[in-house]
Amino acid sequence: MNNAFKDALKAGRPQIGLWLGLCSSYSAELLAGAGFDWLLIDGEHAPNNVPTVLTQLQAIAPYPSQPVVRPSWNDPVQIKQLLDVGVQTLLVPMVQNAEEARLAVRATRYPPAGIRGVGSALARASRWNRVPDYIHQANDAMCVLVQIETREALKNLPQILDVDGVDGVFIGPADLSADMGHGGNPQHPEVQAAIEDAIQQIRQAGKAPGILMANEQLAKRYLELGALFVAVGVDTTLLARGAEALAARFGAEKTDLGSSGVY
C-alpha cells in the first residue's frame, strides 16, 4: 500500500489542489482530468455524506489527482466510515490543541496505535479482505492533515506540531480572519502576518503547511514561503463566476457579490 499524496509531501514537492463542493461524481471526474495534484472532497461545508464521498473517490480513482477528504468534524465514528470506503488522506477541521490532534491521528490507526474499528471484510479500503495483510499496512498509508482556524489554535501550534502522526497543518484563512476580528478580509495585514508565521513554524517542525487561497497572487506567495499543499480554487466558484461572466458578455446584468478571495 502507498499514498502518493503523503509521499509527495514527504519529498517536499508542492501539491496544487482544487476544492470540490458540488457533491457530484460526474463533476469530480471531469475535474480529476484537469491536472490538479489533489482534489478536496468537502464534507464540512458541502452537503456530502459517506455515499457521495464514495462515488467521488470511485470517479477520481483512474486519474493521477489524489483525493483528500474533509469530514464535518473530528469524529472517530465518521472518520472510521470514511477510511473504510477508501479515504487515505484526511483534512480534519477546527483542531484547537494537541489533544484534538492526537484524537484525529488515533482515529486513523488500528489498535494498539489507535482506535479505528476493524471491519475490513466489509471495507472497500481493503478490497473486502483481498489486500494481503491490510490491517498491518493501513496505518502507515494514512495521511493526517489538521486544520487550524482560530487564535487558540495558533497559540497551541507548537504543541500540535509535536504530535506524532500529524503529517501536515492546514491554515483556514476564512475562519481565522473571522476569529481575529477581520471577517471576510483574510488579506488584512494582521491575518497575513499570522498566516506567514504559521507557515514558517510548520516548515521548521518538518511538517507540511497547507492553505486554500483563490487569490492567485497570495497563493503563489504562500508557495514561495514554503506551503506544500495549496488549493487554488473551488468548483462552485469556478462554475458560478464563469457562468455569470458568460451571461454578462451577452448582455445580462452582472451583480458584484463580493468575495473574500479565499473561496
UniProtKB/Swiss-Prot annotation:
Protein origin, superkingdom: Bacteria
SUPFAM superfamilies: Phosphoenolpyruvate/pyruvate domain
UniProt site positions, description: Transition state stabilizer: 70
UniProt site (Increases basicity of active site His): 84
Catalysed conversion reaction: 4-hydroxy-2-oxoheptanedioate = succinate semialdehyde + pyruvate
Binding residues for a divalent metal cation: 149, 175
Residues annotated for substrate binding in this entry: 147, 174-175
Cited InterPro entries: Aldolase/citrate-lyase_domain, HKHD_aldolase_ent, HpaI, HpcH-HpaI_aldolase, Pyrv/PenolPyrv_kinase-like_dom, Pyrv_kinase-like_dom_sf
Protein name: 4-hydroxy-2-oxo-heptane-1,7-dioate aldolase
Gene of this entry: hpcH
